[in-house]
Every structure is written in C-alpha cells, then in structure tokens.
C-alpha cells in the first residue's frame, strides 16, 4: 500500500487562502519524518505490532508513505491513514528531529552520486528550488517551526491532492472501507492553494562546477 501527496521539495512557495508561505529548503522531507511521530509515540512501533514493514520517501515533487504486509491489512491501513491524517508537531519534537536529519544530510554530503545530481541542478537553474538538496541543509532545517509544518499539511495533505494505491491480496471494498473508517470519504471544502514559482531565466546558471571530495 502506498499513500502519496503531490508535495515535494520544490514546493517551497505557495499561497494558502490569503496567506503567503515561504519555506526553507528541506521542509517536505522533514515533514515526512515527523509524520511517523504522534502523541501516542512512534508509528513504526504500531506497524511492527501489525507485522507490516513501513517506509517513506520524499522526491522533488511528491512525498510517499508505504507499507507491505501479509496479514492484519485493516489494522495497518488504519495506522497509515491516521498518522498522515492527524499530524502532531511541537517545537520540542522538531528540535529533536533536527539533529537526526542533520546526520542524514551529512551522510548524503559524502555520496558522490548525490553530489553530482545536486551539482548538475545548481548549474542548470538560477533560482528554482530544485537547486536545493531534498533534505535541505543543517542551517535551513534549523529554522523549521510547527506552524510551517501545519501549513503544509493543510495545503497539501488533503484527499484532493493525494493518492492511495494498493496491490496484492485485497479488494477495492476493503480499501474503501478503511477510507470510510478514517474519515477520508467525508465531504470537505478544498483549501485554496496556489503554488508560487520564481522567474527562471532560459539560460544555464553555470557552464561547469567542480566538486572536490576526500577519497576513502
């Protein structure tokens, strides 16, 4: 089962109703991490109790939450939909996560393949958010607040902007029943969201870039 929202690392500037929101690099990925934590604890522990193997990832244009299970599918569906549908953030939990994600950022800084991709994007684009690493930087994620995360949830974590897909030993009726149980079938007004894009010249930002890394 995979539950995905059309919200990724490049969605950093948008208008939510009458409010303009400008995000630092790395918010979508940071939010992905925080979705697994609520007032009751860790969603990974809940998935473990149902026997499911859960994971998630953030890309430039989407965030996806997924699990694989051979039994207790209903229980795992409830865990997935509840954790995504009922976010919980505090400054204390955000401060804790900043250190964890900071280590992940440093790990990717040591990846030649990933540095090549980000370096290429920096050469191609002048100001488009795709220039920034999906995880952001240690400095950018240090500015993340609960309000930012709640704004992102309100704008992009709504049924009209999400897709739920399932494959395997299940039925459409079982999946729809889970959506019904967790309130996804209830009519709700769609938020007025407008993505704001920066003007991007038709020329490359740089013709070349040199990255030097230590050899292990």
Regions flagged by a language model, labelled:
Residues 1-43, 150-216:
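His/Glu-rich zincin catalytic helix
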């Amino acid at each position: 089962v995979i539950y995905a929202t059309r919200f990724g690392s490049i969605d950093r500037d948008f208008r939510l109703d009458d409010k303009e929101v400008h995000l630092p690099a790395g918010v979508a990925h940071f939010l992905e991490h925080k979705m697994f934590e609520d007032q009751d604890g860790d969603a990974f522990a809940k998935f473990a109790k149902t026997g499911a193997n859960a994971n998630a990832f953030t890309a430039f244009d989407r965030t996806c939450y997924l699990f694989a299970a051979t039994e207790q599918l209903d229980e795992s569906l409830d865990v997935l939909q509840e954790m995504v549908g009922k976010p919980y953030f505090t400054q204390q939990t955000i401060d804790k996560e900043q250190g964890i994600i900071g280590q992940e950022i440093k790990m990717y800084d040591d990846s030649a393949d990933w540095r090549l991709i980000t370096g290429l994007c920096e050469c191609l684009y002048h100001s488009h958010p795709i220039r920034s690493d999906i995880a952001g930087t240690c400095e950018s994620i240090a500015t993340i607040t609960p309000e930012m995360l709640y704004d992102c949830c309100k704008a992009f974590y709504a049924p009209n902007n999400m897709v739920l897909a399932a494959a395997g030993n299940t039925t459409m009726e079982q999946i729809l029943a889970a959506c019904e149980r967790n309130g996804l079938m209830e009519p709700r007004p769609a938020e007025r969201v407008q993505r704001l894009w920066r003007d991007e010249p038709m020329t490359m930002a740089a013709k070349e870039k040199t990255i030097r890394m230590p050899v292990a």
